[in-house]
Amino acid sequence: MMMVMQPEGLGAGEGRFAGGGGGGEYMEQEEDWDRDLLLDPAWEKQQRKTFTAWCNSHLRKAGTQIENIEEDFRNGLKLMLLLEVISGERLPRPDKGKMRFHKIANVNKALDFIASKGVKLVSIGAEEIVDGNLKMTLGMIWTIILRFAIQDISVEETSAKEGLLLWCQRKTAPYRNVNVQNFHTSWKDGLALCALIHRHRPDLIDYAKLRKDDPIGNLNTAFEVAEKYLDIPKMLDAEDIVNTPKPDEKAIMTYVSCFYHAFAGAEQAETAANRICKVLAVNQENEKLMEEYEKLASELLEWIRRTVPWLENRVGEPSMSAMQRKLEDFRDYRRLHKPPRIQEKCQLEINFNTLQTKLRLSHRPAFMPSEGKLVSDIANAWRGLEQVEKGYEDWLLSEIRRLQRLQHLAEKFRQKASLHEAWTRGKEEMLSQRDYDSALLQEVRALLRRHEAFESDLAAHQDRVEHIAALAQELNELDYHEAASVNSRCQAICDQWDNLGTLTQKRRDALERMEKLLETIDRLQLEFARRAAPFNNWLDGAVEDLQDVWLVHSVEETQSLLTAHDQFKATLPEADRERGAIMGIQGEIQKICQTYGLRPCSTNPYITLSPQDINTKWDMVRKLVPSCDQTLQEELARQQVNERLRRQFAAQANAIGPWIQAKVEEVGRLAAGLAGSLEEQMAGLRQQEQNIINYKTNIDRLEGDHQLLQESLVFDNKHTVYSMEHIRVGWEQLLTSIARTINEVENQVLTRDAKGLSQEQLNEFRASFNHFDRKQNGMMEPDDFRACLISMGYDLGEVEFARIMTMVDPNAAGVVTFQAFIDFMTRETAETDTTEQVVASFKILAGDKNYITPEELRRELPAKQAEYCIRRMVPYKGSGAPAGALDYVAFSSALYGESDL
């Protein structure tokens, strides 16, 4: 039976009986009812019919019924049977005789049973019931109805009558033309009864088609539907109710109480179904979050798996253009492809933390991602990616520098090789001549002196040949892609140089043999040769230096070249005086030859170099000097532009770097100790996040300056300690830090709302947490957490502390976050669903059976939730169950992680 408050103001029989606990009003109303019975036969008729139907609705459970209420209860047998059915208890054994005293004994047993239930019977005796007194019989039945059908009805601590009336008012409140104020006139038009049925079973009555001006039709509709579908027998006549100015209150209450008991079970089932739906909705939402996490983690890990081999590829390119394309591809990767993945990684951590918080709040087991997809696994993969990425960028820059130097060395090798090949051209043929065989003494001496001058020139070229060989060696060491042609050319030069040395030595030996025969020599020609050869060598060196190719990286290096060039120009007057002196010697030679008509006047036997050659080279030097001036000034201008780019980048980087560091520290301080309410903290963090987002334009501007530097092949900057990589890493760290802090506050709001915490409680928890957070990093280590618990009065042994650590650190990370700390401290006060509650709810739907059928699930739950349960429940293995029965106990345990689905 329903456990509700006993009714007030209901009783039977002119003060002769009253329900135990009904009070004075109970008796007063019954006295009014008795007097009305004497005056209004219509009420007697209604009560007789209603009470007879009510008794039969219970007696039919025992396989019997009554026809005449005052006659069929006279022997007391059916009266005792009625009491046994409605109370569920056994009465004393009835007397089997048919004598009057046997009947009186049976009726007394029934009345004694009623009195044992706390009901006082006044002036109702067994003799009156045995004699068929209708008034006393109706009063006795009404007393039974009050005690066993109405007394237990209670809504919000009201009496039985008021509780039943309040229940009717609430259920019919939304319906038009229905205003239940009592148990007589409010029910005459039949709409109130139809509204009660429609409220609980809208499929049985089309309320919109009912008319207030058809009370008999409405009443008959309600009676027929109740009898056919709700198992409530017809206890009233529509015509009697409509034609009576004030229908009998007791009859109406008796009939309406049947509706209350019929629908009470349905409401209980509805409550159980709602509880199950709520639990299943939470479980399905968590499963969806788990699937989203797995999907995001798989996609991110797959992208890292595909990207790492590309970054690990260290196969260089032979040309600068190809390496520049590789560098541009890397820039596109950093600018276009990596930032969205950073956002995905951050969102993945946020989703993981939110899911774990929801699981803890709903007392579900902590989410453990599939193998290789833990947050730590993703973090390790990401660190590996960034390590490879840093190595790849360093390799690119070093490879570009290598190719740049290779280009410079190759150009320098070609220039020096060309100059040397031009110098050696014809030298082998010259050294192989035997012109001294028919020469005069003076000619031989001249040939010898000329050969000495050549040897001097040859010795001067030794450094150039060694420099050419050193350049070739360096090109080979730097893996120059045309090293084969360089080696071939260098080998040819070295072989030719060795041959020149051999030929030179052979010619000297021949001339020295001839020198003993030839004595005459022209000292002036010799002097010309001796002075002209070094000067010519100086001219060759000057031309070579003026035509040299420079590779500089700074204004200072360019200034150094300009200084050296100015020093060279300062030596030109002295060189011009030397040239004049040499030309003077040649003039003196010509004068002497002309004076004496000597044969050697047309040529100098000691040197092949003519004065015209010296003048030509001198003119070339004078022409190359301004050209070199212009080239150096252009290089100085280019280096000054690069210097401005360096300073421009440094000015921004020196402002952005400290700003990012300050913001990172500020966010760290906010995460460690926030003040104000969580909403105020969230607003402050959102403002910080917006300020950071607004600052992104400065990062983009710095990226543009960095790209200009790289396009200008500027790779160093002494004006700042912040590289673009430092700025990028700091910016990414700042974005991750503010997102993680916002997520932590959001989870605190979720915890506060779910567990009803006040702001003062949260501040108290935060103060305790910060006190024991020795590293001030937002996480307590196990020893700190244990010290915190002991300071708060916990008596912890090793086993108990290990159990608590399993609760607050389910993933065994070795730290306790503030969110896990709050969850533990508030776990005792949280109102949560449990496995036992869900099992009890399923048991109600199953009608107290230990199993449930698919049909019962589809009838009591929404279609989507019902199919979800049917798919997940395992078959029931107990005895006595029909085919297809499902085990809801195992299913409920699996929802809370106590077993496997």
Curated annotation (Swiss-Prot):
Pfam families per record: CH, EFhand_Ca_insen, Spectrin
Entry's Gene Ontology cellular component terms: actin filament; brush border; cell junction; cell projection; cortical actin cytoskeleton; cytosol; extracellular exosome; focal adhesion
Family annotation (Gene3D superfamilies): 1.20.58.60, Calponin-like domain, EF-hand
Residue ranges annotated for the Calponin-homology (CH) domain, each copy included: 45-149, 158-264
Boundaries of every EF-hand domain copy: 760-795, 796-831
Described function: F-actin cross-linking protein which is thought to anchor actin to a variety of intracellular structures. This is a bundling protein.
Extent of the Spectrin repeats: 288-398, 408-513, 523-634, 644-747
Protein known as: Alpha-actinin-3
Binding site for Ca(2+) 1: 773, 777, 779, 784
Alphabetized UniProt keyword annotations: Acetylation, Actin-binding, Calcium, Metal-binding, Repeat
GO annotation, biological process: actin cytoskeleton organization; bone morphogenesis; focal adhesion assembly; muscle cell development; negative regulation of calcineurin-NFAT signaling cascade; negative regulation of cold-induced thermogenesis; negative regulation of glycolytic process; negative regulation of oxidative phosphorylation
N-acetylmethionine PTM positions: 1
Residues that coordinate or bind Ca(2+) 2: 809, 811
Record region (Actin-binding): 1-261
Single annotated GO MF: calcium ion binding
Subunit structure: Homodimer; antiparallel. Also forms heterodimers with ACTN2. Interacts with MYOZ1.
Keyword Phosphoprotein carried by entry: no
Family, similarity comment: Belongs to the alpha-actinin family.
Alphabetical list of InterPro entries matching this protein: Actinin_actin-bd_CS, CH_dom, CH_dom_sf, EF-hand-dom_pair, EF-hand_Ca_insen, EF_hand_dom, Spectrin/alpha-actinin, Spectrin_repeat
Tissue-wise expression: Expression restricted to fast (type 2) skeletal muscle fibers (at protein level).
